[in-house]
Amino acid sequence: MVRIESLNHRGEGVGRVLSGPYEGLTVFVPGTVPGDVAQTFFVEKKKTFARAQVKRILEQGEGRVGEACPVASKCGGCSWQHMDYGVQLEWKTKIVEEAFHRIARVFDCEISPCVPSPKILGYRNKVEVPVAYENGQVVAGFYEPYTHNVVPAQDCLVEHPAVRNVIKHLLDQVRKRRYKVYNEKTGRGAVRHLVARVAPGTDEAVAVLVSTGHRLSGLNDMASELMESIPNLRSVVLNVNDEATNMIFGDRDYLIAGRPYIQDVFGSETKGSGSLGRLRFRISPRSFYQVNSYQAVNLYTTALSWAELKPNDVVYDVYSGIGTISLFAALRASFVVGVEEVEPAVKDAFRNARDNGIENVTFKAGKAARAIPGLLAEYPRPDVVIMDPPRGGAEKETLAAIADIKPRSIVYVSCNPSTFARDMLFLKERG
């Protein structure tokens, strides 16, 4: 038996074995909440810890609720759904605090409570689902935790309904045309992933088929049928990924029907004090865009509030994507420079600036660490640096370059408390 004492950043229960030869061993158990006493079985055993699955909950901790989705306990997408949302927010705040203390060694910083999302179901504007065979039929869903076993999930409740509809039609087309599914063990087959994205502010959608090659039969007919059957579908794209890799996308996109982007209207209604503003954004299939548009308004509003931008400020936006933060910052500052490694996203960013009539902003393509010295030679030194790196955090070279600039303030937007705390420690040690 295991008593669950806390949660880790994945939402897994962290507990200890209560008796027997492994008494006291730390165990990570998905699908549990603090206070649970569970009968479990090991799926992985190391010297100092183990991973386990639940056989039976013997005592329920506070905050346990029924899962809204029937496959939430099987797929790897919703590791917190068995928990009351208020309890989730409390523990997520604690996880950030723990990262500050354990990794960044910061103990005198006040951590604000988590801001709740306006929507907790039906919010996700993009989904990338692997495909596989099950009993001879093609299925699409999500990977079972710590495996590449696909759990079919056609009615995922966190997805925006329009996203769910696009995936359903894409899957129907793959089945109808009998496209072969890619097998990552043998390297054979064609279709790897189905991808859908919707712009909640306009309802425009894109459908992407990720394949090992571009010579699939009937692509034009498939695209025509999708465009006819899905309301507001603006793009059908084939992405080619012929590498032996776990990366979802390759670097080649083929537009089969429609236009190469969708447009979203994003932000709050007014541009007054304390309000984010409202802008229009073009989004290419592979460009980064916050998957919870509703919560992203809160995120960007908070980030820009903490930046305390002044009318004469120069801002560098590092990892700028399609220019979302850059353009909202440009409404408040004198000049903004965005740096982004993904070239299609940079092209989107320039178009977005033009579409919104914003002229006090520019963008540079390239790795941030290499680009920043060139920016300093071409533009004024920034008063504020805003950075929104991927889950793995920022590169040390990028952090060093930013530290050397010594801006008035750095606003770091993160989706991973552990790598954020690691990077904060680096910046703190650099002064």
Please report, for each region that a protein language model flagged, where it lies by residue:
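Terminal RNA-binding accessory module
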Residues: 1-67, 71, 370
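Short, acidic/hydrophobic/Gly-rich beta-strand patch recurrent on exposed beta strands
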Residues: 13-19, 141-144, 208-210, 349
